[in-house]
Amino acid sequence: SSDVCSSDLNYVGIEMYDSVLLRALQKREKLETEGIHLDNLKFMCMDARLLPEVFDKGEVERIYLNFSDPWPKARHAKRRLTSREFLARYNEILAPEGRVEFKTDNRDLFEFSLEEVEAAGWKLMAHTFDLHHEDAMMEGNVMTEYEEKFSSMGNPICKLVACR
């Protein structure tokens, strides 16, 4: 996005599966052939459980979780990137004013996430069950491919913003 191009911020895209990461790298390469350079965008293939081993305390200002795997089975709840276990990991690397922004079209995962934010003692700064009809929350929204796809199918997009 143009936000990334013009920004003095660094972005790190983290993906556990190399096939997904490969697609991101191919897209970046295509943009660069079009003259769009994303020098401040890096990618890492890793398990997000290792975040505290990769980033220093307070090093990360924002964590964007976009259309994460919902892990629908109850026994897999701890694998969800918005579980209290993951919020504890984010707590270790977020700057004092840091925050987590989460988007999904999966209502069950979103409701689970709202509960986990509260259970972890985090503050819910904003949330909506229908992002594309909330002007205030749409401001500065960067549409992902999944967001465009699900939204065009009529699926409402849920979003929350949380801080500690």
What are the roles of these predicted feature ranges?
Residues 80-99:
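A short glycine-rich, Lys/Arg-flanked "PGG" loop and its adjoining helix->strand segment in the class I
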Residues 1-6:
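Short, small-residue-biased leader/transition segments that mark boundaries at the very start
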Residues 9-14:
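Short beta-strand element of Class I
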Residues 113-164:
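Class I S-adenosyl-L-methionine
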Residues 74-77, 99-120:
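Conserved class I S-adenosyl-L-methionine
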Residues 25-62:
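S-adenosyl-L-methionine
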